[in-house]
Amino acid sequence: MCNEPATSDVALPDLDWAKGDGLLPVIVQDADTLRVLMLGYMNSQALEVTQRSRLVTFYSRSKQRLWTKGERSGHVLHLVAIDADCDADTLLVQARPRGPTCHLGRTSCFPAAPGQFLGALDALVAERERERPQDSYTTALFEQGVRRIAQKVGEEGVETALAGVVQVDDALLDESADLLYHLIVLLRARGLSLADAVTVLEARHR
């Protein structure tokens, strides 16, 4: 099945509020692409409001009050899961953003790291699988079924190997891109995600 982040909460007494004078740093991550969106701070009340409303809410150190992300712009963060780190003094929030997170109109307050596009592509393919927009090549693949998608992966794999053998770098890069795309579509067609495959790689690395 898809490696969908499970909705989870953390217990207030289990967190080390004393270390940060009642505040914990909060890293917000896109639940679908896994891209880091922003950094904020929560006190215990902000955490309680976040868990109750399912809208990510912070404590503003400058205004000395709670503020819900997007309370003016409408670009809210819908809570998916909250986890604490091993020292219980930092929170990781997984959320689904409605609109850009950064006040400058950007997706994230941080620049995109190399390789993050694959996560965004995986999320886009998942969206295509759910919504099935017309005139979309991805939609056409899903409607043809797993067997046809698997056939395309095989074809692209052979073409990638041949491009490597003839040592034409541009062709190898083009075919590799096609292979990665069709592999992501195949994973989604089977109810899996790119993150599931990465988890297997990580387990092997250990």
Swiss-Prot record:
Name its cellular compartments. Cytoplasm
GO CC annotation: cytoplasm
Q: Which domain of life is it from?
A: Bacteria
Q: Tell me the Pfam families matching this sequence.
A: PRA-CH, PRA-PH
Supply the CDD domains for this chain: NTP-PPase_HisIE_like
Q: Where is this region: Phosphoribosyl-ATP pyrophosphohydrolase?
A: 118-206
* Reactions catalysed: 1-(5-phospho-beta-D-ribosyl)-ATP + H2O = 1-(5-phospho-beta-D-ribosyl)-5'-AMP + diphosphate + H(+); 1-(5-phospho-beta-D-ribosyl)-5'-AMP + H2O = 1-(5-phospho-beta-D-ribosyl)-5-[(5-phospho-beta-D-ribosylamino)methylideneamino]imidazole-4-carboxamide
Q: Which parts of the sequence are annotated with region: Phosphoribosyl-AMP cyclohydrolase? A: 1-117
**Signal sequence region:** none
UniProt keyword terms in alphabetical order: Amino-acid biosynthesis, ATP-binding, Cytoplasm, Histidine biosynthesis, Hydrolase, Multifunctional enzyme, Nucleotide-binding
Q: What is its EC number?
A: 3.5.4.19, 3.6.1.31
Which InterPro entries does this UniProt record tie to the protein? His_synth_HisIE (IPR023019), HisE (IPR008179), PRib-ATP_PPHydrolase-like (IPR021130), PRib_AMP_CycHydrolase_dom (IPR002496), PRib_AMP_CycHydrolase_sf (IPR038019)
List the GO molecular function terms.
ATP binding; phosphoribosyl-AMP cyclohydrolase activity; phosphoribosyl-ATP diphosphatase activity
* GO process annotations (BP): L-histidine biosynthetic process
Q: In which pathway does it act?
A: Amino-acid biosynthesis; L-histidine biosynthesis; L-histidine from 5-phospho-alpha-D-ribose 1-diphosphate: step 2/9; Amino-acid biosynthesis; L-histidine biosynthesis; L-histidine from 5-phospho-alpha-D-ribose 1-diphosphate: step 3/9
Q: Which family does the record assign?
A: In the N-terminal section; belongs to the PRA-CH family.
Q: Which PANTHER family match?
A: HISTIDINE BIOSYNTHESIS BIFUNCTIONAL PROTEIN, HISTIDINE BIOSYNTHESIS BIFUNCTIONAL PROTEIN HISIE
- Which HAMAP family does the record cross-reference, listed alphabetically? HisE, HisIE
Q: What is this protein's record name?
A: Histidine biosynthesis bifunctional protein HisIE
